[in-house]
């Protein structure tokens, strides 16, 4: 019976729950030093997160934290595959001690569908995923009628996933270490494309296949071709090798060069990489101490 006494002392705390039907975590951040937690409402910030049966957050409430001391509620939902395709904006509601709102989705929509928010009917960020087990995002829309997915004048972020092509011409910069471990930058030409499976095993560390990630920003339109896009090339380890942006469809490259240990040793901004490529005919290697961004290799 002695071991039960401490447990019985804490049982009364269980009746203070914000909800008798939902799992939740109630956290308090104090704005003043306290040893007992006995402070006023203005001296603390209380946040409550409710969870479903799978342990996923379904509602977040910042208790009494609006300018007029109302609760700030954020609705969270998932699709049939468990993905969070829509991230809703929070809305303010009468302070109810952080209790769970069963009509949070309806209240969110009605809160923003007013003149104050230009009668917004999509108060959420929306992400569309490709139909594959990888669940890679292919399109992202922002809140607001002008930014929603499917709008005639669409302003969404689009993503494409490809592999290296011959037209990409990605330089294969490497780091060479001398006998005294002095690093030098070496241009090995361009990365090879379309290696056979047997060749990949043998030459994986010399010319690994690169993966190409294309991001088209909210202002992109088909007539832009490459303008308003960014191309990110990564190796089989997931390391960024090249970031390519465009101005009037002219590419501007930033290279990231790693040593044999995987450490990022060089970052070559567009001007530096352009000069190095221009001088690649006579270039063997450049000591790090002699390489100056924007200057000729010496």
Report each predicted region and the residues it spans.
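N-terminal signal peptide c-region/cleavage motif recognized by signal peptidases
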Residues: 12-14
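Sec-dependent signal peptide recognition
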Residues: 2-9
């Amino acid at each position: 019976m002695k071991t039960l006494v401490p447990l019985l002392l804490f049982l009364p705390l269980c009746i203070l729950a914000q909800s008798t039907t939902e799992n939740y975590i109630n956290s308090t951040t104090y704005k003043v030093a306290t040893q007992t937690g006995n402070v006023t409402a203005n001296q603390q910030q209380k946040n409550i997160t409710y969870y479903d049966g799978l342990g996923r957050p379904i509602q977040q409430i910042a208790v009494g934290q609006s300018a007029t001391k109302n609760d700030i509620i954020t609705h969270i939902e998932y699709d049939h595959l468990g993905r969070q395709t829509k991230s809703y904006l929070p809305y303010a509601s009468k302070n109810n001690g952080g209790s769970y709102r069963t009509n949070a989705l309806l209240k969110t929509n009605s809160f923003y569908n007013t003149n104050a928010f230009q009668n917004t009917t999509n108060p959420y960020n929306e992400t569309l995923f490709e139909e594959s087990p990888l669940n890679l995002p292919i399109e992202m829309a922002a809140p607001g009628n002008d930014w929603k997915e499917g709008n005639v004048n669409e302003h969404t972020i689009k993503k494409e996933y490809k592999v290296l092509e011959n037209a990409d011409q990605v330089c294969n910069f490497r780091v060479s270490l001398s006998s005294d471990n002095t690093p030098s930058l070496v241009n090995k030409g361009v990365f090879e494309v379309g290696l056979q499976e047997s060749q990949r095993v043998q030459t994986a560390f010399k010319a690994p296949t690169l993966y190409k990630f294309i991001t088209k920003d909210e202002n992109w339109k088909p007539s832009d071709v490459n303008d308003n896009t960014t191309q990110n090339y990564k190796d089989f380890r997931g390391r960024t090798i090249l970031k390519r942006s465009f101005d009037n469809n002219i590419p501007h490259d930033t290279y990231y060069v790693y040593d044999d240990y995987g450490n990022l040793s060089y970052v070559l901004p567009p001007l530096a990489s352009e000069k190095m490529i221009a001088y690649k005919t006579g270039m063997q290697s450049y000591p790090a101490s002699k390489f100056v961004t924007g200057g000729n290799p010496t």
